[in-house]
A protein has these predicted regions:
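Short alpha-helical segment of the dimerization/phosphotransfer core of two-component systems
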Residues: 170-175
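Short beta-strand/loop element within the Bergerat-fold HATPase_c
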Residues: 260-272
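PAS-family sensory/regulatory modules and their coupling/dimerization elements
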Residues: 55-116
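Short helix N-cap motif at coil->helix boundaries in the Bergerat
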Residues: 202, 284-295
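Conserved micro-motifs of the catalytic ATP-binding
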Residues: 190-195, 234-237
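Conserved glycine-rich
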Residues: 327-328
């Protein structure tokens, strides 16, 4: 009998140790109170989520207003109540349940951090709102000008009619660009946009992009200069995508620098990394906007961006492409006016990374 009792106690102790280890290391918080509301368990995750020590986790202070203790303690064991608590900038989802139907039972609360989930939901809502806004404006213009042409009939001069049709074409082009950019982002987000990886000369890609922007730079009376050697390393990457990134950065400098400005392109290599910087002497980016310029649809100068046909998606697409290449696209802090954007890329790609699509 003694040996059986000893084995039983040992088994119970082992099970308790397993549970203690589980509660100790689980990412969700767990708090338990006895039937009188006294704390009997609080794991480290709960303390971290609540920003309190175990002794400070008083039910009446933390949870009573969300779900009264008297209500939870009288619920059936299979029932539970959901709630949510905000702790600083953190959103915590709560699940209340009794852990016994007996009077001597208590209340168990599971805490789950949903901060990132809530942020994702907000970004999704903002994204949908932005898409709706960006498409609504050109659609309204197209409808307005089309109705004017139809209603005016022969009273509209050929020159005016052509001007109106030019607006319609321009706005449909703008909607097409938005849809194309959205599809590109969707493919990048889902990983369905494969990179055609191959070795190519980094300097040759810069040369190609400079040739593509020379005419537009001259139209704005900009001085476009460059400083880099032709013997920069060959890099592994999708040349078309990398040139798309370079073109976006350089085109932004050309578009948003007041006419008659100076735009300078420099490039080089450091260890296993190549880099390119595009610096302009425009008005620069306000400090409050610097952390957001790579966000989708975010534009510092919305009016000018729309005038130039910008969708507000270019830099976010560029960032996605660069990240797929294990590189970085950043703003460089520098004194004085103007903006400097730096692109950094590894010369080789990690084994099993994007070069697996080569």
């Amino acid at each position: 009998m003694a040996s059986v009792l000893h084995s039983t106690l040992e088994a119970v102790e082992n099970e308790r140790n397993k549970l203690d280890t589980l509660f100790l290391h689980m990412s969700d918080g767990v708090v338990a109170y006895d039937g009188s509301g006294k704390l009997i368990h609080c794991n480290p995750a709960a303390c971290e989520l609540l920003g309190r020590t175990a002794d400070e986790c008083v039910y009446s202070e933390l949870f009573e207003s969300i779900c009264p203790f008297s209500h939870v303690i009288t619920m059936q064991r299979s029932d539970y109540v959901e709630g949510e608590l905000t702790v600083g900038e953190r959103s915590v989802e709560l699940y209340f349940a009794p852990f016994s139907d007996e009077e001597s039972g208590g209340v168990l609360i599971v805490l789950h951090d949903v901060t990132e989930q809530r942020k994702t939901e907000e970004r999704r809502k903002e994204f949908v709102a932005n898409v709706s806004h960006e498409l609504r404006t050109p659609l309204t213009n197209v409808r307005s000008y089309a109705e004017t042409i139809r209603e005016a009939g022969d009273d509209l001069s050929r020159e005016t009619e052509n001007d109106f049709l030019d607006v319609v074409i321009s706005e449909t082009d703008r909607m097409t660009h938005i849809v194309q950019d959205l599809l590109t982002l969707s493919r990048l987000d889902s990983g369905r946009s494969e990179m055609n990886m191959a070795r190519f000369p980094f300097s040759a890609a810069i040369d190609s992009v400079l040739r593509s922007t020379e005419l537009e730079a001259r139209r704005h009376k900009h001085e476009l200069t460059h400083d880099y050697t032709e013997n920069l390393p060959l890099i592994m990457g999708d040349r078309g995508r990398i040139e798309q990134v370079m073109l976006n950065v350089l085109s932004n400098a050309v578009k948003y620098t007041p006419d008659g400005g100076h735009i300078r392109v420099t490039a080089g290599s450091e260890g296993e990394t190549v880099w390119m910087e595009v610096a302009d002497d425009g008005i620069g980016i306000p400090e409050a906007d610097r952390s957001r310029i790579f966000e989708r649809f975010y534009r510092v100068d919305k009016a000018r961006s729309r005038e130039s046909g910008g969708t507000g998606l270019g830099l976010s697409i560029a960032t996605e492409i660069v990240q797929r290449h294990h590189g970085s696209l950043t703003l460089v802090d520098r004194p004085g006016p103007g903006t400097t954007v730096r692109l950094e890329l590894p010369i080789t790609q990690p084994i099993g990374g994007e070069d697996s699509h080569e």
